[in-house]
């Protein structure tokens, strides 16, 4: 406990800085900032005034490390950096920290359009966004391709190809790679696409309509039809925007709290367009003020890949505006104003974001409480020492002993944790021996990169024979984790599941019980992930091995088929005429492909 470090705390400087609470094996438990380090650390000595969570943390602290900074701004930035890199156990945990997806147009002589997430490279790309979902980006790029015939290929492919790719054949690219369009004309199309992304749709539409009418008056009806289609696709892009608008680039933030959870929502405007409201959730908030939570969030949010606009709006309850402004200036290298709403429009937008935060938080808590109720009941049924926070579910998949794969699905008190999922390509040749496959998967799981993360409960898709396998692996690796094997009934029907545990008789649960339905959902998710992972592996191998075996199919035709159809499944569903549309594929070759693909899929499925 910290009392034994009383002398160290008393000798701490009365200056700005950051402190780290460090536990066993040099594990960082908490990172905090302070305007006065000595005063802040002294607060931890008032043990009776601390929350239970902080008391538990302090019982694990072995030492305190101090970093002095020049001012509060540097302390805020350093704290955010350390929290992001160290992920301390007792700090606020932000969920959904993904970068916003953007659309990029490269600064190449013949620019490429693409979807992008990550840190910005301003010397190489123009960025447009942010968008609230990858689906919105994909649809917008597709519409821009159809409207302006822009390339999406890599620069390497662009510089090396000798003939147009399938994008040209399906009228989504003008093939600048092989001079099917002049550089000036292509750059004009790029300019129109950029203007569209900047919100100048009306100007671009008028240009396209003028050209369409000109072509029509000159009786060049084929070209006029092309420009007519461009206008149609341009209008589709316009339809995707939502109702709210704001004159300047701005982000509106709100924060709503209940219990130990906070929801921070952001509503973004770029080029007068609304890009939607996105909720983020922060855990472990009970000991922090709204100012602390939001200031840390904003620095992390804009210190990743999200470029701050010229102004952001925060609730009136946030008072540290100047500190946030100075921190964001250091992050963005440009002035960013942090404002309170001053007029009805701004207040309405902040209220809209607040309402979204409130709704998202309420739904999150409802889901959490429902899930917690199931987990409490599960812990009683399976005699677990505590309510599980991390459940790992394991399943295997193979076809006649080939293409063997094992998967791990993870669930917590908030639902499935998809970023924690893992798949294991079975290295040994076990010819479909499920016991040996499970042994390899569990051995690799508990001796690999994430061996330090110990779950509270394991659920194995298997029967009584798996119990000894799991027990042996855990004993060899000195892992103490409760587990159960879940097997379907004699007819492999859901609802007749039997459970097998070490030292207990087999048992079943009522088909309509909440825990039974929950366990079925865990098992089904593992099965889905196993099948999906296996299918991807199978299709990849199928592409390489099976398409290559078809006489007349080389690498170029194989790539053209996959570029056009996207998957083997889509090829099998295609018509003869559709396959003939691929450059270089005759009617006879198309018939061979269809026959071969459908036969192989029949065998595989």
Curated annotation (Swiss-Prot):
- GO MF, one annotated term: excinuclease ABC activity
Q: Which domain of life is it from?
A: Bacteria
Matching Gene3D superfamilies: 5' to 3' exonuclease, C-terminal subdomain (1.10.150.20), GIY-YIG endonuclease (3.40.1440.10), UvrC, RNAse H endonuclease domain (3.30.420.340)
Q: Report domain GIY-YIG positions.
A: 14-92
Entry keyword set = Cytoplasm, DNA damage, DNA excision, DNA repair, Excision nuclease, SOS response
Q: What broad class describes the main subcellular location of this protein?
A: cytoplasm
Q: Which CDD domains match?
A: GIY-YIG_UvrC_Cho (cd10434)
Q: Which InterPro entries match?
A: GIY-YIG_endonuc, GIY-YIG_endonuc_sf, GIY-YIG_UvrC_Cho, Hlx-hairpin-Hlx_DNA-bd_motif, RuvA_2-like, UVR_dom, UVR_dom_sf, UvrABC_protein_C
An example GO biological process term is: nucleotide-excision repair
PROSITE patterns found in the cross-reference section: GIY_YIG (PS50164), UVRC (PS50165)
Task: Identify its protein family.
Answer: Belongs to the UvrC family.
PANTHER family on file: UVRABC SYSTEM PROTEIN C, UVRC/OXIDOREDUCTASE
HAMAP family documented for this protein: UvrC (MF_00203)
What is the protein's given name? Answer: UvrABC system protein C
Taxonomic lineage of this organism? Bacteria, Pseudomonadati, Pseudomonadota, Alphaproteobacteria, Rickettsiales
């Amino acid at each position: 406990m910290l009392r034994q470090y009383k002398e160290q705390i008393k000798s701490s400087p009365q200056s700005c800085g950051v402190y780290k609470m460090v536990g066993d094996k040099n594990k960082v438990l908490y990172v905090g900032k302070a305007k006065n380090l000595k005063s802040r650390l002294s607060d931890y000595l008032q043990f009776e005034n601390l929350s239970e969570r902080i008391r538990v943390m302090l019982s694990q602290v072995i030492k305190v490390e101090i970093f002095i900074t020049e001012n509060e701004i540097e302390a805020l930035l350093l704290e955010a950096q350390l929290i992001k890199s160290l992920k301390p156990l007792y700090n606020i945990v932000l969920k959904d920290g993904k970068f916003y997806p953007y659309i990029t147009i490269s600064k190449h002589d013949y620019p490429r359009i693409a979807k992008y997430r990550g840190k910005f490279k301003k010397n190489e790309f123009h960025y447009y966004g942010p968008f609230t979902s990858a689906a919105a980006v994909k649809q917008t790029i597709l519409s821009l391709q159809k409207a302006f015939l822009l390339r999406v290929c890599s620069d390497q492919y662009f510089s090396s190809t000798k003939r147009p790719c399938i994008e040209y054949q399906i009228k989504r690219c003008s093939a600048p790679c092989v001079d099917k369009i002049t550089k000036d004309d292509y750059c004009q199309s790029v300019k129109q696409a950029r203007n569209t992304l900047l919100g100048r749709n009306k100007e671009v539409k008028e240009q396209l309509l003028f050209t369409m009418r000109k072509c029509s008056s000159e009786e060049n009806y084929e070209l006029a039809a092309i420009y007519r289609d461009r206008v149609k696709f341009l209008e589709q892009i316009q339809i995707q925007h939502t109702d709210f608008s704001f004159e300047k680039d701005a982000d509106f933030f709100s924060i709503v709290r209940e219990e130990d959870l906070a929801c921070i929502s952001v509503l973004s405007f770029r080029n007068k367009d609304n890009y939607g409201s996105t909720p983020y959730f922060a855990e472990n908030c009970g000991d922090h003020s709204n100012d602390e939570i939001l200031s840390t969030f904003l620095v992390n949010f804009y210190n990743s890949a999200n470029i701050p606009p010229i102004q952001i709006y925060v609730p009136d309850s946030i008072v540290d505006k100047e500190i946030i402004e100075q921190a964001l200036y250091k992050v963005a290298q440009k002035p960013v104003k942090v404002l309170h709403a001053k007029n009805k429009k701004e207040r309405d937008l902040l209220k809209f974001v607040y309402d979204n935060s409130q709704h998202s938080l309420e739904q999150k808590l409802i889901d959490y409480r429902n899930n917690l109720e199931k987990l409490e009941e599960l812990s009683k049924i399976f005699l677990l020492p505590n309510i599980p926070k991390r459940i790992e579910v394991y399943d295997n998949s193979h076809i006649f002993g080939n293409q063997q794969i094992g998967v791990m699905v993870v669930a917590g008190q908030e639902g499935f944790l998809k970023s924690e999922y893992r798949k294991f390509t079975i290295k040994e040749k076990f010819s479909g021996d499920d016991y040996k496959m499970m042994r390899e998967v569990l051995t690799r799981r508990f001796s690999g990169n994430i061996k330090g993360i110990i779950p509270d409960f394991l659920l194995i898709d298997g029967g009584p024979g798996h119990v000894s396998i799991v027990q042996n692996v855990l004993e060899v690796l000195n892992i103490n984790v409760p587990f159960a094997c879940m097997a379907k009934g004699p007819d492999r029907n859901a609802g007749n599941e039997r459970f097998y545990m070490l030292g207990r008789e087999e048992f079943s649960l009522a088909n309509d019980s909440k825990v039974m339905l929950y366990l079925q959902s865990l098992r089904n998710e593992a099965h889905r992930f196993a099948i999906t992972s296996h299918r991807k592996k199978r299709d990849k191998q199928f592409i390489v091995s099976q398409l290559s075996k078809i006489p007349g199919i080389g690498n170029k035709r194989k790539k053209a088929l996959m570029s056009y159809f996207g998957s083997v499944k889509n090829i099998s569903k295609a018509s003869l005429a559709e396959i003939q549309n691929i450059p270089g594929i005759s009617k006879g070759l198309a018939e061979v492909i269809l026959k071969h693909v459908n036969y192989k899929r029949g065998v595989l499925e």
